Every structure is written in structure tokens, then in C-alpha cells.
């Protein structure tokens, strides 16, 4: 078995591969050697936070992440700031996003997800949104790409 070398290391975290890219951040799959678990790491270059509003948005995102404690909301594990980057360490969801899952399902089975499976997914999404709304948080970008799946292993 070949052991992969990490792309980079920050304290007890080994960044193994890029699993997502966005306009302002990359997301890495990392290993937390201290907790012996996989985490997702949102890496935001400080250079992307050039305006005061962008810094305010990052602080607000962190406040919300630390406040939200719900089984169907991805939890924050840690936050680190270096000279060049901000790192948000999150629970890793091993199933990818719902958009990719639906596309793969349709490609493989030649029909959309069945109604019972969609209901099962919604029974997990709705309580999370209700919890957020009860805490005066409105998610302004609900879409399949932003719904992450976690399959039992």
C-alpha cells in the first residue's frame, strides 16, 4: 500500500487533496492526527479578503458555524489564521453534495431519485432549516450543491 504525501501540513492537520474549489476558497480533505479523523478544510487566502465587508462576512460565518449545533448541520471543528490564509476546519461529509449525487444517480439508473428517497432527504433538511430559523439564521444560498451527504461507513 502506497502512503500519500500530504499537500501541506498545519499543526496536527495533514492536507491530503483538494475536494472543492470556489471563487474565494479551496476545500481540502485533511487528516486531523490529534483526533484521528478526516476533516474538510475551507482555505481562504487573506488576499481574497481585501474589503472590510469580506472580513465582516468571514467573521459572521464563523459566528454562525460556532453557534449552530444540530446533527444535520455541518459542524465546525477549528479555525486557524496564518499570515496568508484563514482555515475553517469542518466535519467531513463523505458523500459529496446532493447535486453530484443526483447527476450520478440519473446517469447510472436513467431516472431521477424516487419519491421515498427524496422524502428521506427532506426529513433531514427541513429540521436543520427550522433550527437555523429558530436561531434567527437565514441560509440565503440553499441549493443542491450546498447540501452535503454523509453515508454511514
Segments (PLM) and residue ranges:
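Catalytic-loop of the protein kinase fold
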Residues: 133-149
